[in-house]
């Protein structure tokens, strides 16, 4: 299974070619795709991929592996949100995926042991490793006109106690102190929850002072100096806020929740507390512009 991002297309293609050279009968599934049309396009443009999956993949991927292992590939159309090949033709699911994994389930906790065993085997220094965590999925706002990040994803939050336990356990188990969050908005329109989450991160950092949060994304609306200071104390070094434009008029037109003033104040407080603001993109040439 290959998680497909824009920056990984070439790497995924090369990996797929090598796998097919070694084992032509191997089934390669590509995921992390936003729409049905994009999934079809991947199969049209990359011959080494056999199946493309769009939207959330945990449950469909489980059903897919069951069908393949039981040699029931003629039943693939019953699995939601996949495109696949049959006799040179690209077909798609008859049904949408309606099954979404419980983010707080321990069954979803990743095990990176084999990855770090390989790092040790090849002598790769652990300082280059970065652990990824998820405290929620999709976005509570879902209104920004240009955003494609949440297509096929259902918004829901993870129990913060589960996330904090996962972080503490992973840091202890793997000895990795650089982490990042994959959430589109760590605050999730719930400042009390975010405050409690920061408290938990600070407790972990007391035990592991080297803990560094190298990426986290938030919506700047409603964030004040106290919150930014607490983020710094919790270990945040880099944050993304979805800046997009210095024009309030344009931000309103594209339905951003951020405002020029909320972005400016966050950048001011972040500078004060030594948090780097990453990915402060300025969008140009929008239809609304």
Feature map (PLM): residue ranges:
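Structural beta-sheet core signal
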Residues: 30, 215, 279-281
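Short, intrinsically disordered, charge-balanced linker/junction segments flanking boundaries
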Residues: 3-14, 91, 264-274, 279, ...
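Glycine-rich beta-alpha loop elements in corrinoid/cobalamin-binding modules
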Residues: 1-97
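Short, solvent-exposed loop/turn segments at secondary-structure junctions
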Residues: 1, 34-36, 58-60, 97-100, ...
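Short beta-alpha connecting loops at secondary-structure transitions
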Residues: 251, 281-282
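Radical SAM [4Fe-4S] cluster-binding motif and immediate context
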Residues: 108-276
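Catalytic cores of alpha/beta
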Residues: 39-45, 226-228, 286-289
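Conserved ATP/PPi-binding loop(s) of AMP-dependent carboxylate-activating enzymes
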Residues: 96-114
